[in-house]
UniProtKB/Swiss-Prot annotation:
Belongs to the eIF-1A family. It comes from Pyrococcus abyssi (strain GE5 / Orsay). The gene is eIF1A. This is Translation initiation factor 1A. Residues 12-87 form the S1-like domain. The keyword Protein biosynthesis applies. The lineage of its organism: Archaea, Methanobacteriati, Methanobacteriota, Thermococci, Thermococcales.
Amino acid sequence: MPKKERKVEGDEVIRVPLPEGNQLFGVVEQALGAGWMDVRCEDGKIRRCRIPGKLRRRVWIRVGDLVIVQPWPVQSDKRGDIVYRYTQTQVDWLLRKGKITQEFLTGGSLLVE
């Protein structure tokens, strides 16, 4: 039996999520396997972040992707969870609006805000 076809809508307007509370922007530096990644966060720290199962089953995260990181309550400067991965279109929008800098994406200086 063929799979049910999904209806594809035209250009949908979706709000770009921004970090809230103690969440941070981060760039994936290295994939470690078993759902773990090293992420360089906007505060200059490199955190070992886990991809929760809810996100792991839906989104493929690669080295160089811009993500939102939620630091853990314990070991907040060393560990965290990846909450969201931005698409390239969303990254371009964040650059245009001044939320992040090109240097942050390429490994240089930190964010503007």
